[in-house]
Amino acid sequence: MPTVDDILEHIGEFHLFQKQTFFLLALLSGAFTPIYVGIVFLGFTPNHHCRSPGVAELSQRCGWSPAEELNYTVPGLGSAGEVSFLSQCMRYEVDWNQSTLDCVDPLSSLAANRSHLPLSPCEHGWVYDTPGSSIVTEFNLVCAHSWMLDLFQSLVNVGFFIGAVGIGYLADRFGRKFCLLVTILINAISGVLMAISPNYAWMLVFRFLQGLVSKAGWLIGYILITEFVGLGYRRTVGICYQIAFTVGLLILAGVAYALPNWRWLQFAVTLPNFCFLLYFWCIPESPRWLISQNKNAKAMKIIKHIAKKNGKSVPVSLQSLTADEDTGMKLNPSFLDLVRTPQIRKHTLILMYNWFTSSVLYQGLIMHMGLAGDNIYLDFFYSALVEFPAAFIIILTIDRIGRRYPWAVSNMVAGAACLASVFIPDDLQWLKITVACLGRMGITIAYEMVCLVNAELYPTYIRNLAVLVCSSMCDIGGIVTPFLVYRLTDIWLEFPLVVFAVVGLVAGGLVLLLPETKGKALPETIEDAEKMQRPRKKKEKRIYLQVKKAELS
């Protein structure tokens, strides 16, 4: 009996219907960007210092410039105005309203040396050096409360983790289209509610809800488009779907620049989700899923609709459907299957580490850029541009060179770029940006490679389980990354880059221990997967020479 792939060969593997559907789902992919990396703009932390009652009035009376006001009233500023923990989180215990204070050096009358003046934590809020607003400036997520910004982003990734597993199961149980529309609706409503949140706690709840459904919706969109196209187009369409995410990065930078208020920015990036609800009339259910649920009549109706859209017709001989998988006895996948045999166990551990590393470096580099960059909008835009050549490199090398070497090199390039950035002087900003973009391109290639190779190393009956379990480390990485970046920068601004360099270089080395999958059929059994080892040419040649030598003697 024919499969969906057999029918698509006759009615079009990537014709008008698939192109229209891809365009619609690509919009969904781009709209996921603000949730995944929006913390750069929503959680932007500008320079700040304690608000002290009476300072503004004294500054106005004395006619100080902003720089003079900071120099006279803020502790811990360096000679060039460098910020520190003291300047941002501590204040002089001085009554600035007293009339005896001098305009030239107001603290000289209180102590011969400023370092002898008592300090105390900020009690009256902060003054932020920015014309816009972020969740940091509105809810004062600085100093003793800075961990609350880490929690904000980590909770999104907790939602990613739970939603990808739970909603992924529901999509297999109740259908792709239904779950896609539900995730879009919840994402849209919770996004609007977050924009009007009265306090930090409610904002946290609604952001978690967005995380719970948004990544799951992105994954369902990925599954849908790959199930609508023919076998020969799946990999290319999958890469292009991720390129749409990159386009979303570029658009996000422009929207964030135009809307420096975080609430308006949140509204702007959320409202398009309501338009995606129109997909109810534009995108049908996956015929492959319908067949797997023994709903062949509905599947054939959709297939005929696709054929009509493509200007084709379904041959009568192909109108009896069967699932792509064998309908005989099926093995039940088990988590133990991922670690029971030596080669698969090695694959599982290396892939889990690489998923974790890809997430930490990808999100971490973006977050660090928001802290260290001079212009976060331009830096974000430039670093997003390098994801286009990253996708081109993958398409160019994956079937020519293979998976293993480009993947290993990309990890090592990302790690080396992070390490090099530590030693580049601040006055060579152009070089810092160039090296940062190189690192971003490297980790982008690694991220997309691990998505592909993960499915190619496991036998059929545990393939989905293996991808699910290994990729869950991606969300674990996303949970720890905010704490890693924001806390380590409190110690030293470049400290996170050193950590990124180490984990990236280790990941590249571990990839070389995996077998090459280029040109190899997908393993069907445990035995097939266990035999996917690199050819040991040198050892075989040595044995051959020893045999010939023995024959001659």
Curated annotation (Swiss-Prot):
Transmembrane segments: 22-42, 151-171, 178-198, 211-231, 239-259, 264-284, 349-369, 376-396, 405-425, 433-453, 465-485, 495-515
Keywords recorded for this protein, A-Z: Cell membrane, Glycoprotein, Ion transport, Membrane, Phosphoprotein, Transmembrane, Transmembrane helix, Transport
Swiss-Prot/TrEMBL catalytic activity: (R)-noradrenaline(out) = (R)-noradrenaline(in); (R)-adrenaline(out) = (R)-adrenaline(in); serotonin(out) = serotonin(in); dopamine(out) = dopamine(in)
Record topology, Cytoplasmic segments: 1-21, 172-177, 232-238, 285-348, 397-404, 454-464, 516-553
Membrane topology: Multi-pass membrane protein
GO molecular function annotations of the record: acetylcholine transmembrane transporter activity; amine transmembrane transporter activity; choline transmembrane transporter activity; efflux transmembrane transporter activity; L-arginine transmembrane transporter activity; monoamine transmembrane transporter activity; neurotransmitter transmembrane transporter activity; organic anion transmembrane transporter activity
Site-annotated residues for Involved in recognition of organic cations and participates in structural changes that occur during translocation of organic cations: C451
Expression across tissues: Expressed in kidney and ureter. To a lower extent, also expressed in brain and embryo.
Modifications made to the protein after synthesis: Tyrosine phosphorylated by tyrosine-protein kinase YES1.
Pfam families: Sugar_tr
InterPro entries to which the protein is assigned, alphabetical: MFS_dom (IPR020846), MFS_sugar_transport-like (IPR005828), MFS_trans_sf (IPR036259), Orgcat_transp/SVOP (IPR004749), Sugar_transporter_CS (IPR005829)
Motif (Proline-rich sequence): 284-288
Remarks, miscellaneous: Mediates the renal secretion of many clinically used cationic drugs. Transports drugs such as diabetes treatment medicine metformin and neurotoxins 1-methyl-4-phenylpyridinium (MPP(+)), famotidine, ranitidine, amantadine, acriflavine, amiloride, memantine, cimetidine, cisplatin, oxaliplatin, platinum-based drugs cisplatin and oxaliplatin, 3'-azido-3'-deoxythymidine (AZT) and tetraethylammonium (TEA). Mediates the bidirectional transport of MPP(+). Metformin competitively inhibits OCT1-mediated thiamine uptake, leading to a decrease in hepatic steatosis.
Protein name (Swiss-Prot/TrEMBL): Solute carrier family 22 member 2
Organism of provenance: Mus musculus
Organism ancestry: Eukaryota, Metazoa, Chordata, Craniata, Vertebrata
